[in-house]
Amino acid sequence: MRLIIEPDYDKLSTWAADYVIERIHKAAPTAEKPFVLGLPTGSSPIGMYRELVKACKEGCISFRHVITFNMDEYVGLATEHPESYHSFMHRHLFDHIDILPQNIHILNGNAPDLTAECDAYERAIEAAGGIDLFIGGIGPDGHIAFNEPGSSLTSRTRIKTLTTDTVLANSRFFDNDTNQVPKRALTVGVGTIMDAREVMILVNGHTKARALREAVEGAVSQMWTITALQLHRQSIIVCDEAACVELKVGTYNYFKDIERNNL
């Protein structure tokens, strides 16, 4: 596992966007062999998306041969609702880059058969050749996607009931009214994420400090699903200084030292 520690959120976002661009360029995707990208929502990736949009508009990167799969979507929230993840992704990324509409994949939380929708999503990922780079964020309780504490570390795409903590955290997007927040979601599983050839997680702010500590220094546990990343063959956590306040001094200094030429 790599840990990239940047001074602040803006620097974190720029580093993450530059890494995505680098990986796409290195893959040199074509229509026959596209680059497959897993994408998150929430507040953490917004800065990265802003930088990717800027790079695309400046001609530094093209998404024409990129296929995307989003991590999750609320159940029962209309696609056109401003807080649906469909709306979020189009607002922050898809409407501003040259990605082909048919290459965008987001779970349908209003599907008549939600289990069938989840199974079809897994098959679509497999048919695309698997995910080259899965990007994600984490919650204060260490959940990745909507894999709440207690989720199986081998889980696949499925329906999940959200914890009270997650509902409270997400209520900031719903006028701080928990009654408006959907209580269920469709989400890729921990196993789905771990199948990606590479995983990059964005962690910012002091509210994520304990989760980062568990991710880097804690034992692998289903109670902190982010800890599964320790077992991944190629994983990166990109964080800011505020998220590092609970790391041991030795841990912090170690990663600052070995990554000093990559910041």
From Swiss-Prot:
CDD domains reported in the protein's UniProt record: GlcN6P_deaminase
Active-site residues, as the UniProt record annotates them: 72 (proton acceptor), 141 (for ring-opening step), 143 (proton acceptor), 148 (for ring-opening step)
Catalysis: reaction(s): alpha-D-glucosamine 6-phosphate + H2O = beta-D-fructose 6-phosphate + NH4(+)
UniProtKB keywords: Allosteric enzyme, Carbohydrate metabolism, Hydrolase
Biological process annotations from GO: carbohydrate metabolic process; glucosamine catabolic process; N-acetylglucosamine catabolic process; N-acetylneuraminate catabolic process
The protein's Enzyme Commission number: 3.5.99.6
Cellular component GO terms, alphabetical: cytoplasm
Site-annotated residues for Part of the allosteric site: 151, 158, 160-161, 254
Keyword presence, Hydrolase: yes
Pathway: Amino-sugar metabolism; N-acetylneuraminate degradation; D-fructose 6-phosphate from N-acetylneuraminate: step 5/5
Regulation: Allosterically activated by N-acetylglucosamine 6-phosphate (GlcNAc6P).
Known role: Catalyzes the reversible isomerization-deamination of glucosamine 6-phosphate (GlcN6P) to form fructose 6-phosphate (Fru6P) and ammonium ion.
Entry similarity comment: Belongs to the glucosamine/galactosamine-6-phosphate isomerase family. NagB subfamily.
UniProt name for this protein: Glucosamine-6-phosphate deaminase
Organism: Porphyromonas gingivalis (strain ATCC 33277 / DSM 20709 / CIP 103683 / JCM 12257 / NCTC 11834 / 2561)
The gene coding this protein: nagB
